[in-house]
A protein has these predicted regions:
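SAM-dependent methyltransferase catalytic region
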Residues: 1-133
């Protein structure tokens, strides 16, 4: 469990064994680094209410939390969660923790528990050419 201490230090409450970390390759980005990444997003992109952001290996949601906090300077939280943020996370416990931290339900269509390599990225919306005909 020596590596689990790192995961707990980045804001997660999920206990992960070393075996789990070995088998899943889970690596969690510290909140300070997430905030630094978000600070590099141009203000015009953050202000644009049509901008969308995807984290396809969301873990417990640190990047999305940092982004959500920054977007709240320009938009209402409901608009951000329902129109701007999207996430895919493989592990059900990470997914549940991410949703709780973001203030959304686990069945919110923008925040899915799925394998990012096989997910269709529809987020509950119809996809394909026929949608635009």
């Amino acid at each position: 469990m020596k590596r689990n201490a790192h995961n707990q230090n980045v804001g997660s409450k999920v206990v992960r064994s070393d075996d789990r970390i070995d088998s899943t390759g889970e690596v969690f980005t510290p909140m300070e680094l997430c905030m630094k990444m978000v600070s590099n997003i141009p203000q015009s992109v953050l202000e644009n209410d049509k901008s969308t952001f995807l984290d396809n290996s969301a873990g417990s949601g640190n990047f999305l939390l940092a982004l959500q906090a920054e977007l709240c300077k320009y938009h209402k939280l409901s608009h951000i969660n329902d129109n701007m943020l999207y996430a895919v996370e493989l592990m059900p416990d990470n997914h549940a923790e991410m949703c709780k931290r973001l203030g959304v339900s686990v069945d919110h269509p923008h925040f899915v528990c799925a394998d990012a390599l096989n997910y269709d990225y529809s987020f509950g919306k119809p996809i394909g050419v026929e949608v635009y005909m």
